[in-house]
């Protein structure tokens, strides 16, 4: 390497941290890293070759089993679709198309360049244009789960969620009565109409509840009020992802930590990703990369790049199958942003237009891949190295 790590450490005023790390590596009995990427960095910057590369793992007991994947996905997906219905329907002149749809997500720390959020959103913008031009009857909803500075919650959105919940509760109260009316109509072979199922007072009450729905000038891009110069809003504008009614790809910026009591999705992170169809992680730099691994463990397809330690390990061990890989590894090493965006767009289009049966096969392959990274298995690497 032509780098002078010590000089750079002083230039960036991190000499104390650097010297501690360098000497820790120098005098350690066993020196390891989690990936080939960090092993190369260690040799260049800390001047010691690693004794072994020990990949990171996860506790698979926290994730659904093969048998549970379909049931939990359906449950969590339906909760997400319900949120999407409440979020978008006040602004659409046609019915909100949530049933014939796919749920994608991006997540991670707010490192827009490193995490690849920029190329991901630009590729999604291209996908939006392609789906519109080809008039493909599918809708993509993309959540951006990235904690960020907020001004306030979007009160209109929150009030609408409360209103729709009120309507749902009212219909629950009427359920037995509506069931009885429907049953009588069927038994007596009478024509079924709205008037037969709901009386005038009930219709008026429903109209009263719906009258509380609030609208803004355009469909919101986020669950929260953000600063006007927010970097994600700038990227949405650049990518043409503005949540117009005709858009096939719509975005929901979710700038808070997911929680079962956050007031919007009311799901924790693992539940939210389990209810999705695809996680998108086109990182520019990732020593390991837990987010795609967690996504696979949840039984969900993922996209990552060859600049992550996780993808490097998968390729080195030849764990992928060509037909249903479960995860797609985009070439990002020595590639321009334009080349990355093009390949990512092609992969997104391929996944979007998959048959349902093929998506299901990829889901199970994703979960199978994750089984290689259970700590129950990987801990043996540490024990063997220690005993040697």
Residue ranges of model-derived segments:
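Catalytic cores of nucleotide-sugar-dependent glycosyltransferases that transfer UDP/GDP/TDP-activated
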Residues: 1-388
